[in-house]
Amino acid sequence: MFRGASAINLDTKGRIAIPKRYREPLHAEFNSQIVITVDFQSPCLLLYPFDEWSKIEAKLLLLSDTRATERAMKRLLLGYAHECELDGNGRILLPPPLRQYANLEKRAMLVGQLNKFELWDETAWQKQIEQSRETIQSEEFADNERLADFSL
């Protein structure tokens, strides 16, 4: 399970180094294989261990190609999907279209989301955090039944 936020840098070739604390679990459990795609709701990338991505693909197979919204989701997620493997230094290469989608240039945030990572441009991440704080303080949050009994 992946948790926590790590500040990372892209090198001149568009590679990122996965923090050391994640490398061993990724290697041992997932043979260092990752699938990267776009988040269709936010300007960030999603990095899935290959086994987790297989579950997403199974769900995508159930979507219709004749319904425009379902087809659009499949086209976006699968069209951008890129398989990669950590190199000997724990790095992965982000293809230019993926870097462009998330506006990734130099400084980024790798954020654990249990079964996957989100990869954000550092400035976009800070804006998103502020928006999340505002959402948590809103009436919409207070009225959410699924969160009514959630406590820390």
From Swiss-Prot:
Keyword DNA-binding listed: yes
Gene3D superfamilies per record: Transcriptional regulator MraZ domain
Main location: cytoplasm
InterPro entries linked: MraZ, MraZ_C, MraZ_dom, MraZ_N, MraZ_sf, SpoVT-AbrB_dom, SpoVT-AbrB_sf
One CC-aspect GO term: nucleoid
Keywords, ordered alphabetically: Cytoplasm, DNA-binding, Repeat, Transcription, Transcription regulation
Domain SpoVT-AbrB, chain residue ranges per copy: 5-52, 81-124
GO terms of molecular function: DNA-binding transcription factor activity; transcription cis-regulatory region binding
Entry's Gene Ontology BP terms: negative regulation of DNA-templated transcription initiation
Coiled-coil residues: none
Key word NAD present: no
Subcellular location: Cytoplasm, Nucleoid
Similarity comment: family membership: Belongs to the MraZ family.
Subunit structure: Forms oligomers.
UniProt cross-references to PANTHER family, sorted A to Z: TRANSCRIPTIONAL REGULATOR MRAZ
Name of the featured protein: Transcriptional regulator MraZ
Native source species: Shewanella sediminis (strain HAW-EB3)
